[in-house]
Amino acid sequence: MPDYINFHSRNFLIRKFISLVIKILVFFPDWLFCLVWNLILLMINNSVRISLIKDGRFLVKDKIQSMEIVHKKRFEFYLQNISTRLNHISYEYMLDSVKFSPGDTIIDCGANIGELYLAIDQNYQAEFKYYGFEPAPKEFSALNNNTRNLVEKPLALSSNTENRNFYIRTKTADSSFEEGKNQKKIHVECMTIDDYFKEIKSITLLKL
């Protein structure tokens, strides 16, 4: 269990139980996964809820906000609340070291579901121009919904402008151009940063 998940109760047995549940429930059908998790979270007085959208996409809600995620294995990162997860993203990417100003340009290569965008939007409240690149179809759909349709189309950044094979592994969010085990192959459009951003003179943050 990620160490930043801190349930309302610190009881050791409850934490061990939740850890076991996380490992077991991912094998349940999507609808049953949501039902059982919501019952458990209700019993431990946790406000987080999860519902199935379709095709392996889920909506996570807490008392304050909601966001779309892909693959139920990723739900464990939101078990305290969405804000805590986004704070962890800010810490992982050391966003406190970036001086954000109005009009900044942020490029998110491999944006997945848009957690970087949401973390900056939540913690820094700066007006910025966001460009997210995500070629995987399900992740792109969630990205587009989470960023309020800021991303125009599924696209990958690469060293050449071309079409390439792309290997998806949604469960662990480590899809790439390199073929690996248990990955789905798709064909994606790729562009270089120079080709895509011909008129942009300054980039505040580039996440690769």
Listing of model-derived features with the role each one plays in the protein:
Residues 1-133, 138-145, 198:
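S-adenosyl-L-methionine
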Residues 111, 157-158, 208:
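Short, surface-exposed acidic/glycine-rich loop or hinge patches that mediate macromolecular interfaces
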Residues 65-95, 153-201:
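Glycine-rich adenosyl-binding loop in Rossmann-like folds that engage adenosine-containing cofactors
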Residues 202-207:
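Short SAM/SAH-binding signature in class I
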